[in-house]
Amino acid sequence: MIKLSFRPVNGLTAILFIGVLLLIDQWVKIYIKLNYPLTLYGQDAIVDWGFFKLLFVENKGMAMGTRLDTILPFLSEKTAKLLLTSFRLLAIMGLGYWLWDSLRQKNNTVLPYALSLIFAGALGNIVDSVFYGVWFTSSYGQVANWASGSGYAPLFFGHVVDMLQFPLVEWTWPEWLPWIGGERYLFFEYIFNAADSWITIGVMLLLLFNKKIFPPQGEKIQV
């Protein structure tokens, strides 16, 4: 059985780790933004290796393109976007406190890694949502530039840049199946970015080491 071990993390290490992850995420996004126009999902891919595609799409909503005004249709698109960005800011403040507390206690090694990954990913997407509308011109039908005056959207109304897709398996559901019969299905069709990957890895660490990170009351933390 393979046993994973994690080196203890201090505050400086966590900051550097988050900084490197954030730098990677933002470098990729800005490079894509300043060199390519928006692509249409499977069409005009920047890179197309079959199992992997490098694209450029902008996400106005949440994970997998879900939009808050679609879930709550009584909200306008503008209100939904502002609420979503505000929620993200509150969430990252909570994550920051949780990370600080885990570092302060010094009795857990895997939790700071997991929280640092999630924090870096959340922060990366918040930068897009808050600042990209002001920093850049539009990418629709053209390559964006740094905005010398006004950008494509006001502060807090930027779009998250996504570019990675792994369409590994494609099939058509049998006709006899109710509701989905005859429909094409692609796994994994969703387009994401490096920040989403950091969040996913962090959440997976929390799930994999759940019993060690959050042991029953009275038991000693083992990680």
Task: Say what each PLM segment does.
Residues M1-V223:
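Alpha-helical transmembrane bundles and membrane-interface segments of multipass inner-membrane proteins
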